[in-house]
């Protein structure tokens, strides 16, 4: 999975049961990856080298950004999916577990995309290969209001802090 944000290409990979990683790559004005030749890394040819990277939890399927927050979708099999919002971190390429806010979704979430204040969510539960084993079949792209999601989260936190 990958996304483009703030002049950089972010790339991640899916893993089932072990931590995965995301990496950030520089892109020039024409949209090409910026290649580097670093003899200290044993390179005798130019290639794209990540500006930075971070480990993320397993089963990530999609990635996007909203208001300088990193959003990752996580899913595998028939277990509930989740979208996790991470605040920007100076230490770990956005992935600060202490700042994570998680939203639960039906199983088999895949790609996520932000346009303005809207989050678009796509599932694979209606695909032929998975529909017979899926409890909740979502056969369309969902459009969700990110300000409403954040407002809901603030209300939940406010109610919890009262106790």
Task: Give, region by region, the residue ranges found by the protein language model.
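Hydrophobic, aromatic-enriched interface-forming segments
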Residues: 1-51
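Structural motif
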Residues: 17-28, 78-88, 127-155
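Surface-exposed loop and turn segments in beta-propeller and other repeat-based domains
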Residues: 30-57, 93-106, 156-163
């Amino acid at each position: 999975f990958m996304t483009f944000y703030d002049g950089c290409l972010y790339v991640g990979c899916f893993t089932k049961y072990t931590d995965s990683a995301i990496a950030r790559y520089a892109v020039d004005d024409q949209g090409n990856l910026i290649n580097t030749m670093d003899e200290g890394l044993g390179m005798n040819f130019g290639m794209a080298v990540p500006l930075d990277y971070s480990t993320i939890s397993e089963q990530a399927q999609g990635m996007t950004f909203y208001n300088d927050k990193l959003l990752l979708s996580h899913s595998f099999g028939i277990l509930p999916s989740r979208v996790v919002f991470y605040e920007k971190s100076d230490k770990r390429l956005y992935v600060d577990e202490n700042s994570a806010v998680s939203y639960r979704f039906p199983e088999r979430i895949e790609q996520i995309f932000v346009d303005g204040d809207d989050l678009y969510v796509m599932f694979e539960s209606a695909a032929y290969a998975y529909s017979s084993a899926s409890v909740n079949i979502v056969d369309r792209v969902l459009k969700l209001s990110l300000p409403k999601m954040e407002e809901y989260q603030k209300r939940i936190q406010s109610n919890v802090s009262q106790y």
